[in-house]
UniProtKB/Swiss-Prot annotation:
It comes from Mus musculus (Mouse). It comes from the Eukaryota. This is Ewing's tumor-associated antigen 1 homolog. The modification Phosphoserine is found at residue 467. It is found in: Nucleus.
Length: 877
């Protein structure tokens, strides 16, 4: 084998030795052997590897000769070893070492890299220089070294490249190619010029807008001056004739004068005055906004004193013309008001109210017939309300009930009062929406009487009364004209109050010697009545309406009070008022409490607020019950006085009421209830007992603090009999027929302005409330929820003070109980039989059940407090 191989090797060498190209044979052989492996790379880098291939071919040929000589022709494969070595050398030449930058370029750079484009040139200097340029470019990209050109112009501070950043701007574009300094300066100049041009465009647009605004201001000044001349001519031409009532309202005209008196009148002067430049005035109008026009228009160009005085004189003339016009239309407006008959009365409008109007500060100004005055005159009234209270007399009537413990501060925020102006022969009653919050200092609660004397006489005060029946066409209910004299009473603190009381003429109550009377109490579906019939003929209620002014109020506010004289047959009837109200076992009181609690059942929760309300109500019940029990014990000793003395005092009271026109009543201190917190009051009673139907009266008689007083014939003083804080409501269309016995019991109804429910004072629909007297419970468990108040707007009673639902059965409680020794009382009741549902409710809302619920509420409160303490995190110092 070896010889054979050696023979073949020798024959090969001979063959190559015999060839003419002997010297180049090793090189060609090596190139031929390594061409298949190195051919792709040789095409790209032939010039770079040519010298290495020559040296490799020479070394391989020498190794082959030495090995052949050592083997002696016995190893035929010795010649193939250099081919493999050359192969490795060529590969190592093409695939460079990791330290070679060319290899890194081929591996780590993409095809778009500038390095791959320079590999085929065969010069390492270019490769290294290109790589160094790329590194500097990367460094420049991280930290640019080219400085920005400095702009010396002030405009460049705001709109140039180096501008102060006011708004978040877009990131600047970064050029990948290194630009020369000249190119960078050229680009910055172009951008600066573009921004400067844009700024000039904005300035031109703003200038156009300013010029247009100046033109509008000039037109406005001319129009204002023309309107000023028209106003002067209009006031002089529009004089009301004797038959035509001009359809104007005083307040809008006054408001227009008030707003334009300084500008329009100043610009409406003649040319003889000092002229002023229109352009300068337009510039001032452009500088100042609308809120400063009243100042800048007058003070802009140094107007003369005579010019301003002339403006004030013309303003006074306009006021005088307006005043004459209002006074001329006073009587015509009165006739129009009296001739308008309301067809139906809504529950939200009082029967004494004809039209909604506002009283303005002008003296002798009647209520304007325009219903839009409420909205227009709100601001003027708030501005001038102090002058109104100081100059314009008005009477505030109210039909709200006292709280259990009324505070001494004035509770008169956001209330609606009724202003009544009474003339000598006619009555003008209007309703105003007045904001009485804040101050009632130096207020006068008087009537606008035409006479200037303090002690005047009010004639025919109750001549006209409006019927509360919607279907009744006759609006006036005539009464017999009587004179009632009034006197001025000045208290210690309220020093300038002139107190007048307009007393409606009631029908005189007939006397009856008999003491027997029948109490007929019946209930229907939606109405119930309480009527007291005498044995012979039914007689009606006499009402005493004095005015009560508290003297210890710190804010000088004035409360109006009413006292109702309920004529009973015996003095001892009043002593039993307390016992019937304080008795929890009374079925009537229990049923009322059940009704009150049942209405709250739907909204009652076991929350913290309801528990607090429940416990507070229970505490109030216990406290007031103890106070009234003491009052009832004291009243029992006073009540059983001599009947003869009571009879004589009743007779004296009757005679005094008949001689009222010629007698001035002295100021007598009335009884102070315990629930008034020792608040002294001065009472000026004017007893008027006339025949009249209470059902036709528009007033709602509310009784909250009952002070039953007895008159003794010996000392002619009134002593307190008892104090009762239960609540009564005498419906506006109800009839209370009381037989006047031999003595009278006075139940004083102290009313004052309340803060919450005066706006809900209204008369109800008479179809549902005819012949009805509502008895209110003594204590009211109420939450301030508007759902509970919706059912009572129809019931002609202030909202939140009734605890019965008017749609359900209404319980009727007797106002007076006759004495068993002197009178016999028969109760005839046609009440519904008690159903299982009512029995269940009676059991559910019994005093024991209420006490149990109270204990549960206390337990829940304690558990909640304990849970709060336990759940609180303990902080360690």
């Amino acid at each position: 084998m070896q010889l054979k191989d050696g023979g073949t090797g020798m024959s090969r060498r001979r063959k190559h030795a015999d060839s003419p190209a002997r010297r180049s044979t090793p090189h060609r052989a090596a190139a031929k052997n390594c061409r298949p492996a190195a051919e792709p790379w040789l095409r790209e880098s032939r010039a770079a590897c040519s010298s290495q291939l020559r040296r490799a071919g020479t070394r391989s040929a020498r190794r082959a000769q030495r090995q052949a000589a050592a083997d002696g022709g016995r190893s035929p494969r010795g010649k193939e070893t250099p081919v493999q070595i050359v192969k490795m050398d060529l590969l190592s030449c093409t695939f460079s070492s990791p330290n070679d930058p060319d290899g890194q370029t081929d591996i780590f750079w993409d095809q778009n890299s500038p390095m791959t484009k320079q590999l085929g040139k065969g010069r390492k200097k270019q490769i290294s220089s290109a790589y160094s340029d790329e590194i500097s470019h990367i460094v420049n990209r991280i930290a640019p070294q080219d400085e920005k050109p400095v702009t010396n112009s002030m405009l460049g501070v705001w709109i140039g490249e180096t501008a102060i950043p006011c708004t978040p701007g877009v990131a600047k574009e970064k050029s990948r190619v290194k630009a020369s300094c000249t190119k960078l300066k050229t680009k910055n100049r172009e951008k600066e010029l573009m921004k400067l041009a844009q700024q000039f465009d904005k300035n031109m647009e703003e200038l156009d807008v300013i010029q247009e605004q100046d033109g509008k201001n000039h037109d406005f000044i001319q129009m204002t001056s023309k309107m000023g001349h028209l106003d002067n001519h209009k006031d002089s031409v529009q004089k009301p004739s004797g038959d035509v009532v001009p359809e104007i309202t005083c307040t809008p005209v006054k408001k227009q004068m008030k707003g334009d008196s300084r500008i329009s009148l100043a610009k409406a002067q003649d040319s003889s005055q000092k002229p002023f430049d229109q352009n300068v005035e337009a510039a001032f109008n452009a500088i100042f906004d609308g809120s400063t026009q009243m100042c800048s228009g007058q003070l802009s160009q140094d107007l003369l004193d005579a010019f301003l005085n002339n403006s004030k004189t013309s303003l006074r003339k306009k006021n005088a013309l307006l005043q004459e016009e209002i006074i001329t239309t006073e009587t015509l407006l009165t006739e129009n008001l009296l001739n308008k008959t309301p067809i139906s009365l809504s529950p939200q409008i009082d029967t004494t109210v004809i039209l909604n109007s506002c009283v303005t500060p002008c003296p002798k100004t009647p209520a304007a017939p325009d219903t839009q005055l409420d909205e227009l005159t709100a601001n003027d009234f708030e501005d001038d309300w102090e002058s109104l209270l100081g100059s314009e007399p008005f009477l505030m009537e109210n039909a709200e009930m006292l709280e259990f413990v009324p505070s001494t501060t004035a509770q008169d925020t956001c209330q609606k009062a009724i202003c009544t102006s009474v003339g000598e022969n006619d009555t003008i009653t209007s309703r105003t929406n007045m904001n009485l919050g804040g101050r009632l200092r130096d207020s006068k609660v008087t009537l606008d009487l035409p006479s200037k004397t303090r002690n005047g006489e009010l004639r025919n005060a109750g001549e006209h009364r409006f019927s509360s029946h919607p279907g009744d066409e006759s609006r006036k209910v005539p009464f017999t004209g009587n004179k009632v004299s009034f006197e001025k009473s000045v208290t210690s603190i309220v020093s300038k109050d002139e107190d007048y009381v307009a007393v409606s003429n009631l029908e005189k109550v007939k006397e009856d010697s008999r003491n027997k009377c029948i109490l007929n109490k019946h209930s229907s579906n939606k109405s119930s009545s309480y009527t007291r019939y005498p044995s012979k003929q039914s007689s009606e209620l006499g009402v005493n309406l004095p005015l009560q002014v508290p003297t210890t109020d710190p804010f000088d506010s004035v409360f109006l009070g009413k006292e109702n004289i309920v004529c009973s047959t015996n003095q001892s009837h009043g002593s039993k008022l307390n016992s019937s109200f304080d008795d929890w076992n009374d079925p009537l009181l229990a049923s009322e409490m059940v009704e009150a609690c049942h209405r709250l059942e739907a909204t009652w929760d076991a929350g913290e607020v309801d528990d607090d309300l429940f416990c507070q109500a229970c505490d109030d019940i216990e406290r007031l019950t103890q106070q009234e029990n003491k009052g009832s014990e004291e009243s029992e000793s006073v009540s059983y006085t001599s009947t003869r003395g009571s009879r004589s005092s009743s007779t004296a009271s009757k005679q005094a009421s008949q001689s009222a026109p010629s007698k001035h009543w002295n100021v007598v201190s009335s009884a102070v209830p315990l629930s008034l917190a020792n608040k002294s009051q001065m009472s000026k009673p004017v007893t008027v007992q006339k025949r009249g139907r209470c059902g036709d009266g528009p007033n709602i008689l509310d009784a909250t603090n009952l002070s039953v007083c007895s008159k003794n014939s010996s000392d002619n003083k009134r002593g307190p009999v008892q104090v009762n804080s239960s609540k009564f409501v005498l419906g506006g269309s109800s009839n209370l027929n009381v037989n006047l016995g031999l003595m009278s019991t006075k139940i004083a109804t102290n009313m004052k302005l309340s803060t919450q429910q005066l706006s809900h004072n209204s008369l109800a629909d008479t179809a549902q409330n005819d012949n009805k007297i509502l008895k209110l419970p003594k204590f009211t468990f109420k939450k301030k929820n508007p759902q509970l108040n919706q059912n009572h707007l129809v019931g002609s009673v202030p909202v939140g003070k009734i605890s019965e639902d008017l749609g359900k059965r209404e319980t009727v409680n007797s106002l007076l109980e006759a004495n068993q020794q002197q009178s016999s009382i028969n109760y005839s009741e046609s009440l519904k039989p008690s159903s299982p549902d009512e029995e269940e409710r009676n059991r559910k809302y019994s005093p024991e059940e209420i006490q149990r619920k109270r204990q549960e509420a206390l337990v829940r409160r304690k558990a909640k407090a304990l849970h709060t303490v336990q759940s609180a995190p303990i902080s360690l110092p």
